[in-house]
Amino acid sequence: MAAAVPDEAVARDVQRLLVQFQDEGGQLLGSPFDVPVDITPDRLQLVCNALLAQEDPLPLAFFVHDAEIVSSLGKTLESQAVETEKVLDIIYQPQAIFRVRAVTRCTSSLEGHSEAVISVAFSPTGKYLASGSGDTTVRFWDLSTETPHFTCKGHRHWVLSISWSPDGRKLASGCKNGQILLWDPSTGKQVGRTLAGHSKWITGLSWEPLHANPECRYVASSSKDGSVRIWDTTAGRCERILTGHTQSVTCLRWGGDGLLYSASQDRTIKVWRAHDGVLCRTLQGHGHWVNTMALSTDYALRTGAFEPAEASVNPQDLQGSLQELKERALSRYNLVRGQGPERLVSGSDDFTLFLWSPAEDKKPLTRMTGHQALINQVLFSPDSRIVASASFDKSIKLWDGRTGKYLASLRGHVAAVYQIAWSADSRLLVSGSSDSTLKVWDVKAQKLAMDLPGHADEVYAVDWSPDGQRVASGGKDKCLRIWRR
């Protein structure tokens, strides 16, 4: 009879596992090696960075079967039924090398608008802040002094939508009577002629990506009239009208691979080829109006050639030739786009979200359910790994950006959540609500980081500057507030 193996030895044998590092795309890194089961993320980071042979070590997160290794590998495995006899795949994920700190206080309350603030938007480098209001004006604010800079008059009705060109040199604004105006943030003057043609109000504006068009010449608009128009801002004329939706177009995205996406109250999303306006496919599935959508590449498209990790204390305009800016924007886009084409997520009045790979398939990848009321806004994190959705059910929900799997609900608002914005490092999220507060959430911990009261009424609009320095908010109390850490 074989000698009984001492218990400690058995215990010791169990304490080691064979693991294999892989990147998110399934690419293997090195060969399998054995580790103690109580290995921590810090130790994994040292080993993984040694294998990657990077000059500067990257901050990494590690996952086993979609669960993040937070304290130790063993702790993560306890919550899962994993066969430990086999080689265990550990997925490593580079994290942002810079860190955005949560904003904690209101540093200015800027008065000037005489009606509700409907939209706020920082320029791609965070140098300028613009707002659109029910008082028919667009305003630019000086961020170094946190004072009003220019008041832009020209619209004859509420300004419903504003959008920065990705080079930060022009702002487009669309109003309730269907007109689009362009503004120069350095002078506050109107640029070129008024773009008129839509018969009803403007619901969305989206610029052609910088890597496709470094002159930032073309902008697309969507309208309650059911059409999408592409405008040549240099010539001041409409290049193309895209028709096919049978009801109001609610939002619009100009993607990085030459496609335009439009969502509508006719329950569909249409995918168009931007250069000739040909309809590629219609995405169907929602049972009610499609209110909102987002692309996995949105943040890279919005910021163009600006790299948040290299932000200076005082944001500047982008320097470099058009060709250099184009190349920088393209490499940033390709990094986020990764192996597959860009993904799209849509949110509807039917309380659901759908995740699509619209360049490839007209069937959704997955349907995301859980909200108890209509969805106001949906956004991919800048690194495209997480989707956040804000709803009239007072919650924000987090979903996996690749699979659409439900991750968590962020609860704390006591009324509808209207708008959300991500910090550039994908670690924090800010939300504005009908309950008059803003809240900053720690996404990894899935909990409230900061409660920001201050507005006297509903908060309609919120944005986080791409350099991470400031959050801006506006709403029914006509006041624009700037929040800093």
UniProtKB/Swiss-Prot annotation:
Coiled-coil parts of chain: none
CDD domains per record: WD40
Origin superkingdom: Eukaryota
UniProt signal peptide: none
GO biological process: hematopoietic stem cell homeostasis; inner cell mass cell differentiation; kidney development; mitotic cell cycle; negative regulation of mitotic cell cycle; Notch signaling pathway; positive regulation of canonical Wnt signaling pathway; regulation of Notch signaling pathway
Any single GO CC term annotated in Swiss-Prot or TrEMBL for this entry: nucleolus
Protein name as it appears in the record: Notchless protein homolog 1
Gene, per the UniProt record: NLE1
